[in-house]
Amino acid sequence: MYKRQVPVGALLAGPSPGFRLDSVFAVSPRPASVAGNGDRQLLFPIIGSAITTSEFGWRLHPIVGQWLMHAGKDFAAPEGTPVVAALSGRVLSSGLAGGYGIAIELEHELPRRRTLYGHLSELYVKAGQTVRQGEVIGRVGSTGLSTGPHLHFELRQPQSGGWVAKDPGDLDLNPLTASGADAVSLLVAQLMNSLERPEGS
């Protein structure tokens, strides 16, 4: 039977030996937010185009080579692509989180749930801050257990005794462009930004 949820532990992102949060915090200018949908539906968490590379469910892990439950969805996008809050909420954790690499976990109310954004290259929020749906919180990267630039996105819901990750299902794909910018302009800007970065950065 296809499992639609899996128990998950706390993200525990934060200080780590040898890791300096300021080395990845607001290194580049923060992009403009996108319009939300009033928190009626999960907003697609990436500005611009992205390809779904791994769905929620059992999969052969590309690094460890074993069948493991994949507790979220993976979206491939160029490194540095802006990542937005899928719902309004409060930042629970922001920092280095084991296999998730540089990651953010947000908590949302009514109904209570959490969203997780993993393998980031840059952060724009810190624990305790509040964010609005569509606000840029980080950038796509390839940190942690990752085979290339992508966003690992999870939806977590409370269950007796803890939290479970659930299939996030369909995401709102409508407001994908930054306020005042069309999709083509945004993609050209992302391309120019990637060309200006020094090799290996």
Question: Can you describe what each PLM-predicted range is?
Answer:
Residues 102-108, 129-186:
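Conserved, short, structured surface segments that act as functional micro-motifs
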Residues 55, 94-95, 123, 140-143:
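Residue-level recognition of beta-strand microenvironments
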Residues 32-34, 54-84:
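Short glycine/threonine/proline-enriched tight-turn/helix- or strand-capping micro-motif at secondary-structure
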Residues 86-121:
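Zn2+-dependent peptidoglycan hydrolase active-site motif and core
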Residues 64-67, 74-75, 103-109, 118, ...:
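Short, acidic/hydrophobic/Gly-rich beta-strand patch recurrent on exposed beta strands
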Residues 3-55, 177-201:
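Polar/charged, compositionally biased leader and regulatory segments
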